[in-house]
Amino acid sequence: MSFNKLESYSNKEVIREEVAILTDLLADITRNLLSPETFEKISLMEDLAVNSKYHELKAIVEELTTDEMVYISRYFSILPLLINISEDVDLAYEINHQNNINQDYLGKLSTTIDLISTRENAQEILENLNVVPVLTAHPTQVQRKTILDLTNHIHSLLRQHRDVKAGLVNEKKWLGNLRRYIELMMQTDMIREKKLKVTNEITNVMEYYNSSFLQAITNFMVEYRRLAEERGIKLDNPKPITMGMWIGGDRDGNPFVTAETLKLSATLQSEVILNYYIDKVYTLYRTFSLSTNLSETSQAVAEMAALSTDKSVYRENEPYRRAFHYIQSKLIQTLLYLKEGNFSNDGQRLTDRAEEKLSAKANLSVSNKGREIIPNYIQSRISETLTELKKEETPSYKTAQEFKEDLQVIYDSLIEHHGEALVSGDLTELLQAVDVFGFFLASIDMRQDSSVHEACVAELLASANIVQDYSSLSEEEKCQVLLKQLLEDPRILSATHEPKSELLQKELEIFKTARQLKDAIGEEVIKQNIISHSTSVSDLLELAIMLKEVGLIDENGARVQIVPLFETIEDLDNSCNTMEKYLSLPIAQKWIASKDNYQEIMLGYSDSNKDGGYLSSCWTLYKAQQQLTAIGDKFGVKITFFHGRGGTVGRGGGPTYEAITSQPLRSINDRIRLTEQGEVIGNKYGNKDAAYYNLEMLVSAAINRMVTHKKSDSHTSDKYERIMDQVVNRSYQIYRDLVFGDERFYDYFFESSPIKAISSFNIGSRPAARKTITEIGGLRAIPWVFSWSQSRVMFPGWYGVGSSFKEFIDEDPENNLAFLQFMYKRWPFFKSLLSNVDMVLSKSNMNIAFEYAQLCEDQNVRDIFNIILDEWQLTKDVILEIEGHDELLAENTYLRDSLHYRMPYFNVLNYIQLELIKRQRNGQLTPDQEKLIHITINGIATGLRNSG
């Protein structure tokens, strides 16, 4: 049975109506800010863009003064943003509406659980499933936080539109509020004046927990359990969704991530979740006014109530209230310990409760860096409670399990005394939240490049007089040295008095901090350590040496899992050899056994794409998962995958449900993790309804892929794979010949794109490259993809696809085309692969791309565009032929309509950006005027709804 995507139920008429309201308001606001002549130019440019009259549009843009471009750029940047808001509001409405009328849609949780409810292993699947979105700070969120805040205000107002039409909200007042926020947006800086710091990235992402994640995940957990129990499936402690975090722990190529940022990230996360608990417990305190005159309580609740510092005579007969007050006091005390950094050198929480620490600052509820994201009323409540805590000893919680046990005492008492209806709602939701978030909120991954680990280990071995030139050893010799240290030598190598390099000192501090945080907050706070550019077993063992230095690993077990990240095509091809050798090591088997026999492997989508092109990347990743899963089976290890996907197709992006359900069979062993980064976080999780829906998609897709056999005919399956091997090998050659084989390509890319402006754009704390860029290989994947998106070529998402498939078809035109069409209908991986290319092509614009090519001074370099254009046309023709359609996005009318609304406006921005780049290169722009290029980058990314 097939279902429609929820987006297909969107109300296009409502969206058009709301877009008309928003655009009229924006036009009226802009008219008041500009001269009649300049506003007339905006109207004309808008008309020309809608009617695709690019030549005339270009002529007008070339005549604009730089001052005129300021507000014109803002106007055409805000227009697509307002359209995005309208679409997001409609989607949020449909999520609620379709669920309320019990309408099935693709990925709906109830339908998915129905699918497996009759299976013998249904309970095992639902109990063990763990899907982990990992939030990263990869710099692709071009919007300032201030603009995002204004966006949220407009979103909230637009959600009232249906009530306005029904007469439930005053229309004049509503329009006035909308106008105010749009006018504020129009006159607010759209770009950051300074580069983000890691601390900014941490606090920014925490806002999503307060606005969406906490409520959405809690609601999802309650629904997950309810649906299972309704179908007779009893679950003990399921965790279908938990959260991951890279910000503060990912130091690969980012020198600004330190031990301090790791500590800040972990402690701020704990503050956020503890404040959430404090707020929820206070709500329960206000609600549970049950009197002993009218109801009974258990002895355990009575004993807890007696410990409360709430001695009001009005609550003498309200034991539940006093019990919740006691719990709240313990939570606040826990928060105070955490806030003041009460960790000793070995990581254990201090027990000193000196009077001055309790009375120091009434607003100690949150850190200075994070105070703004905690509601004021919670800070006030904590301040009031401090006085009580000073008067009488109140313990803190050492673990989240202790907190849950206290809540369970109240829950059990209510159930025992016929309070089934009372426990549903807030109390049940709070218990679910504790299961998922503990006191840590999200597990932080640590990540570093393998070359850094090698340099640190080489220094440690030399300082301890073990090996003086470790890096010169062969791979076999390295492994022998490392294994001897791990198995036979108990020494702490860093304990020598030899002076340490700045790099080694910094790395050791980070690992020490990780140990302290795990001891203080719990094991869940840091579970994985990822090794970028993993190429060998020694890369994994070098990290083990570093972990051993701080007591996070020994010969019997590991407190942190070592996770290799295979990124390039070559490394992915060699990953099976690396992992087979690693899994054969007895010590590695013990480490894995201490992690319930799961071994995670991270797969890099971005670098593999830049290395070999879209087809080669996707197919290499697909085969690697098949082969690595088989190697895990050989050693009795459950291999799980962490997908390092970006927002764009060129970095592994695309529709999430299809991406997961098209993974190889058996590639999801209970667990799957995937990165959510940059603009994707805001688009998917900007409000609790959208967050719930996207989490539902993740879990439903994972379950579907675990239980549904997509390719039952092994002969056909083998033929699929033989065809893919042939096509992909050719695609790889075509891609490499141009990107790395044509000496003109480097100049073409840097001259025909806004890469220099993107590299200076203040959208993240991390540099655009790991080192000075002298070749394409030295450029990070994000600015690489971002630049092609801006120039509207979308090169990483399709180049090499058309020629490789055309050559295969031409070998036997009638039969080969027919079989590719058969594969498209029958093989989810292949359909997802081509659908993503279809989507990327629909966002490209080769008329605009041609104009960017003209930025190249040398005609010989400009000629590269003709190669790209020929491949683009061939790719489009071949894709439509295989799909059996006459136009792009024939199967995704929602996106087609959405692009139809937005595309004319950000097309204008491309022409403005082109003119600005020309003026910049001719020395006609001041430094302040050059910032206009950043505004156009912002607007184009907003219109495309992705960047890097």
Swiss-Prot record:
One of its GO terms (cellular component) is cytosol. One of its GO terms (molecular function) is phosphoenolpyruvate carboxylase activity. The keyword Magnesium applies. Its EC number is 4.1.1.31. One of its GO terms (biological process) is tricarboxylic acid cycle. Its cofactor is Mg(2+). InterPro entries: PEP_COase, PEP_COase_bac/pln-type, PEP_COase_Lys_AS, PEPCASE_His_AS, Pyrv/PenolPyrv_kinase-like_dom. The active site is at residues 138, 610. Forms oxaloacetate, a four-carbon dicarboxylic acid source for the tricarboxylic acid cycle. This is Phosphoenolpyruvate carboxylase.
